[in-house]
């Protein structure tokens, strides 16, 4: 029964090495958040679809930071992006505050295209941990500067204000266009409708001044899935410095599952987890058609100590409860599909996920 629920009976996948890696992070997404979304979608008032059930390999991740049992998003994401434990509040630096090279940066250095897609500000802790290096996650304008210079080919999310309304009066988006040739867009609709840009032109679309609006506040439930498909389409070609079709690395974050947990708002958590499931569906659709793409889903930590206590399976009456408004040390799920997916079938430290991904690409960890 469990195998059927979670997709373990699906087509055989998992051996070999991937050309592309799509890393999906559900910020604050523990097993209970996944369970609630599954029950609602398949047995409650949902439409019955469940994309996370299409994964073929499953594991657990330990999320502790270097200085605490309970991590924050900066330390948790830095562990995933660099394979090193660091202190809470850090992004892309180690306990000694020195920069650590991320898997995104290593991908770019070896001729792969790179991208990030998030529902928070791109300067927030998780995306910052993949392409910035700062001792304090709250240094948003400094992080924006790092991102403007990072080896990114595709950057979509919120946080426009940190690039254009700055204390130093600089307009980083203009600089990215003039100095690095970025195609700058400010509406998701324009990005989705735009013809594919040239292989040598990177894209930045900061489509919200701050974070994306909540699903309950009007964000299109299909937007993130559509942007995921667009990201795969845009990145799936040789990088400008590559001599062959060397693949891509794409990090996607469902950022606001965490915020629902902090607010102890079960409906918020459920809506954002279901949104991430649609993102998973778009990524897996690409991976299945492509045949050379590894998709990994995990979390930086769990938020809220969420439990399902009673009630029905629909969002309005499911008995969702919380033990805290903060993060917890609960282990989080790891799910994978595609070449190399078998490497994710383990109970492992979050730093090990990075090491195994590097191994699949023959990168020095």
What are these regions (language model features)?
Residues 7-9:
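N-terminal signal peptide c-region/cleavage motif recognized by signal peptidases
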Residues 80-88, 204-216, 258-264, 335-337:
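Gly-rich Lys/Arg/Thr-decorated short loops/hinges at beta-loop-alpha junctions or inter-strand turns
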């Amino acid at each position: 029964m469990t195998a059927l629920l979670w997709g373990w009976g699906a087509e055989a996948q998992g051996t070999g090495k991937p050309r592309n890696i799509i890393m999906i992070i559900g910020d604050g997404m523990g097993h209970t958040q996944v369970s609630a979304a599954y029950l609602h979608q398949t047995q409650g008032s949902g439409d019955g679809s469940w994309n996370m059930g299409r994964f073929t390999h499953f594991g657990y991740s330990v999320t502790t930071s270097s200085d605490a049992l309970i991590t924050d998003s900066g330390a948790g994401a830095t562990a995933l992006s660099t394979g090193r434990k660091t202190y809470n509040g850090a992004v892309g630096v180690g306990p000694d505050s020195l920069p650590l090279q991320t898997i995104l940066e290593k991908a770019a250095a070896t001729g792969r295209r790179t991208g990030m897609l998030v529902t928070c500000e791109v300067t927030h802790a998780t995306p910052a941990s993949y392409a910035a290096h700062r001792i304090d996650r709250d240094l948003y304008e400094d992080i924006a500067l790092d991102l403007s210079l990072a080896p990114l080919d595709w950057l979509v999310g919120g946080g426009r204000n940190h690039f254009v309304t700055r204390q130093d009066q600089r307009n980083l988006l203009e600089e990215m266009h003039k100095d690095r040739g970025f195609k700058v867009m400010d509406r998701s609709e324009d990005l989705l409708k735009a013809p594919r840009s040239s292989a040598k032109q990177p894209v930045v679309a900061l489509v919200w001044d701050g974070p994306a609006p909540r699903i309950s506040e009007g964000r299109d439930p299909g937007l993130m899935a559509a942007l995921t498909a667009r990201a795969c389409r845009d990145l799936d070609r040789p990088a400008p410095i590559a001599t062959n079709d060397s693949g891509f690395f794409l990090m996607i974050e469902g950022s606001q599952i965490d915020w629902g947990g902090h607010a102890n708002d079960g409906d918020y958590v459920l809506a954002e987890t279901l949104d991430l499931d649609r993102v998973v569906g778009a990524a897996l659709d690409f991976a299945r058609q492509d045949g050379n793409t590894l998709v990994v889903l995990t979390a930086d930590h769990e938020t809220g100590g969420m439990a399902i206590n009673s009630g029905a399976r629909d969002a309005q009456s499911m008995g969702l409860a919380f033990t805290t408004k903060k993060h917890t040390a609960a282990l989080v799920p790891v799910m994978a599909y595609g070449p190399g997916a078998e490497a994710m079938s383990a109970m492992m430290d979050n730093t090990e996920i990075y090491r195994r991904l590097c191994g699949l690409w023959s990168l020095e960890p």
